[in-house]
């Protein structure tokens, strides 16, 4: 299924600094003197692992700060202690650093500002702009109205300032049960924007907070916290995705009605990243983890940054992907192949080459004995990466798919009675086969031409095919995890039941062999396994006595 791609380009953009509507706004603000510098922030909620959509926001906020010699804060929007955890805080820090960015100073937390936020809530109450409401959640939904019908005022809306202050104090002191009261901004229940219909700005939660412990039992809502945190940190340009476009009205209302330093920050919205065949809902990703459908948040099939990292994606490839898709106000579905193209280009340029046989078939070179050490370049275009030794022995492994007893002319591999070249080695000819009781081929007996190392046969005969191989006498066993798309549809988020759109073949595990040079393959180290694909050593399970390689991406699109 085809989808429009959001600003994806094939050719490399040579501009040093990308251009988009946000950067144009910043240029105008600096030129007019509205701001003398740029301060951005990346404000994740620590209730899950960061995913590819967050990478776009990270690259945008930190990238703008870098390009304008400004600063970017890392601020944790930690206003819901029930769903947040230090595990997520640590993983977010790690992901941002891994992508190659450094935040200004120490990480910040919205909870750092809880005292100030409480003070601003008191100020709104004293101005008659906030009140304590005791409607039940069900009643509040009923009073809120719909997109076509205005809401109606709560019977508690016109309480006196003194009563509201006293009730808010009781909320703070833990004297009111959870769910029995909240603090609401007094704006307009008839507003065409539901977000402005007296939104809740504080609620009661008797939960231990990972930063503040049990100091508080009332917690500010996102819309109240976010804008004030931006103002406290002197953020000049607050960048959010389009779903927060209506929230900008509340962002501005809060700041305009409290006594906080000017100039005030301004919020700008851009399109979120919608990636084909990918789920980015934290709730649904958590479901995959909790149900054991995937091997944790960093499963290589997950769209999390840690999952992509474990699969073999590099920081440079993700940054390049984010650069290519650009920043617009239009929501589009980005084809997954655009992401794959970025890592494929990166690894083609940087990954050393090696040989692996994923479905081994033994061949015996009948006119060869002993062992000959051959050499092969680690990269065809980068001499500085050096060479490696390949032991050529009487018994070798080739892939089962690279031999047929009979084949047409389009099959340019080993065929009974015909020749093929072994990569970085000799031309061999298949002479006969040995089969088991079920007629499966177990061994192919061959001869080799000793005069064909690094050159064509002297008599001018044409040998067109080239296949990879590994010594059957000097090799390392390896596990190959061949990852595919986790879902069978382009938009799994729209599915009523994600179980119905899971790809049963999203992970296929094979046991094969690799050349001995990979004995010390380090976690996350990427290789091009010639004719097979780009793989990396698994960071969790691979070790010297049990090598595990993850398929990062195929050699060509569509394979």
Swiss-Prot record:
GO terms for biological process: glutaminyl-tRNA aminoacylation; glutamyl-tRNA aminoacylation. A motif ('HIGH' region) lies at residues 44-54. It is found in: Cytoplasm. It comes from the Bacteria. The keyword Protein biosynthesis applies. ATP binds at residues 45-47, 51-57, 241, 272-273. Its main location: cytoplasm. A motif ('KMSKS' region) lies at residues 279-283. It catalyses: tRNA(Gln) + L-glutamine + ATP = L-glutaminyl-tRNA(Gln) + AMP + diphosphate. Belongs to the class-I aminoacyl-tRNA synthetase family. This is Glutamine--tRNA ligase. It comes from Pasteurella multocida (strain Pm70).
């Amino acid at each position: 299924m085809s989808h429009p791609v959001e600003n994806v380009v094939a050719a490399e953009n040579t501009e040093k600094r990308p251009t988009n509507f946000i950067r144009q706004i910043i240029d105008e603000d600096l030129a007019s003197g509205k701001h003398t510098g740029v301060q951005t922030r990346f404000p994740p909620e620590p209730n899950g692992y960061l995913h590819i959509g967050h990478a776009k926001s990270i690259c945008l906020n930190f990238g703008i700060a870098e390009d304008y010699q400004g600063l970017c804060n890392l601020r944790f929007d930690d206003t819901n202690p029930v769903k947040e955890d230090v595990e997520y805080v640590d993983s977010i820090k790690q992901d941002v650093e891994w992508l190659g960015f450094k935040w200004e100073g120490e990480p910040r937390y919205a909870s750092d500002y809880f005292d100030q936020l409480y003070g601003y809530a008191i100020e709104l109450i004293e101005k008659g702009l906030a009140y304590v409401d005791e409607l039940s959640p069900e009643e509040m939904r009923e009073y809120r109205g719909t997109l076509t019908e205005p809401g109606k005022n709560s019977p508690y809306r016109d309480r006196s300032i003194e009563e509201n202050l006293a009730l808010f104090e009781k909320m703070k002191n833990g004297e009111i049960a959870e769910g029995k009261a909240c603090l609401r901004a007094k704006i307009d229940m008839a507003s065409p924007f539901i977000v402005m219909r007296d939104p809740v700005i504080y609620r009661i939660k008797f939960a231990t907070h990972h930063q503040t412990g049990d100091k508080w039992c009332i917690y500010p809502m996102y819309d109240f916290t976010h804008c004030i945190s931006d103002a406290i940190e002197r953020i000049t340009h607050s960048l959010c995705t389009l779903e927060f476009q209506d929230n900008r009205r509340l962002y501005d209302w809060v700041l305009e009605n409290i006594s906080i330093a000017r100039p005030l920050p301004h919020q700008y919205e851009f399109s979120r990243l919608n990636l084909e065949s990918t789920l980015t809902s934290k709730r649904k990703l958590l479901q995959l983890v909790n149900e054991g459908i995937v091997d944790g948040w960093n499963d290589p099939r997950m769209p999390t940054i840690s999952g992509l990292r474990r699969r073999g994606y590099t920081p440079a490839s993700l940054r390049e992907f984010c650069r290519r898709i650009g920043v617009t106000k239009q929501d589009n579905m980005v084809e997954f192949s655009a992401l794959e193209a970025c890592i494929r280009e990166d690894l083609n340029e940087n990954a050393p080459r090696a040989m692996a046989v994923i479905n081994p078939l033994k061949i015996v070179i009948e006119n060869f004995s002993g062992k000959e050490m051959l050499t092969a370049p680690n990269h065809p275009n980068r001499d500085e990466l050096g060479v490696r030794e390949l032991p050529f022995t009487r018994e070798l492994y080739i892939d089962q798919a690279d031999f047929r007893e009979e084949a047409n002319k389009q099959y340019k591999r080993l065929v009974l009675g015909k020749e093929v070249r072994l990569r970085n080695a000799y031309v061999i000819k298949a002479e006969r086969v040995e089969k088991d009781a079920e007629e499966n081929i177990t061994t192919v007996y061959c001869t080799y031409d000793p005069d064909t190392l690094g050159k064509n046969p002297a008599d001018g005969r044409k040998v067109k095919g080239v296949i990879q191989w590994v010594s059957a006498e000097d090799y390392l066993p390896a596990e190959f995890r061949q990852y595919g798309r986790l879902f069978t549809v382009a938009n799994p988020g729209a599915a009523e039941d994600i179980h119905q759109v899971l790809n049963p073949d999203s992970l296929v595990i094979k046991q094969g062999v690799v050349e001995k040079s990979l004995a010390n393959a380090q976690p996350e180290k990427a290789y091009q396994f010639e004719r097979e694909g780009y793989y990396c050593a698994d960071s969790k399970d691979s070790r010297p006595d049990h090598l595990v390689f993850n398929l990062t991406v195929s050699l060509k699109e569509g394979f």
